[in-house]
Amino acid sequence: MPMVSLVIFSKKDCTVSLKFAHNTCMTNSDKLNEIFQMQQALNLKIGVDTAHMTDEQRQQWVLNYCRAMTQEIAELTDSVPWKWWAKYQKFDKQNARVEVIDLLHFLISIAQVLEMTSEDFYAAYAKKHQVNLDRQATGYQTKDENDSRHI
C-alpha cells in the first residue's frame, strides 16, 4: 500500500501523516465501501461468490445468512443478563460488541446476495430513515404498506 509523502493535514476524523498509508483518510461512505469490499473478499475466500449466483442460489443464501444472524442474535442476547431469575449474570459489553460485528458481517453478505452496493445500501438506509422519521412525525397510528415502496 503506498505511503503518503510530504502531506500532513488534519480535519475531523481524517488525519494523514507520513507514517500512515494513503487509505487512513476516508469519508464515511468510503468506510462503508471498504466494509463491503472486505466482506466480499472474505466471502470469496470461504467459497461464496455473490456476484455469480442464480436466483435460486440467492434465495438459499438469504436464508443461510438469516439463520446465521438468528444464531448471532442469540449470542448477543446471551451477552446481556436477561435471565431475571439468575443473579450470577454479568453484562459482557466486549462480547456484545463482537456479536454486533458478526451480525454486520452477515447483513452485508445478504445485501451483496441481493446485489446491493455500499452506495445502494446507504441510499436505501437514508430513504427508510426518512420514512421512519415521517412515521414518528405523524404519530405512526396505522401501518401504510406503500410508504416504503420507493426504497
Q: What spans do the regions from the language model cover?
A:
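Flexible "arm" and connector segments at domain edges
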Residues: S5-I8, K12-I151
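Methionine residue identity
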Residues: M1-M3
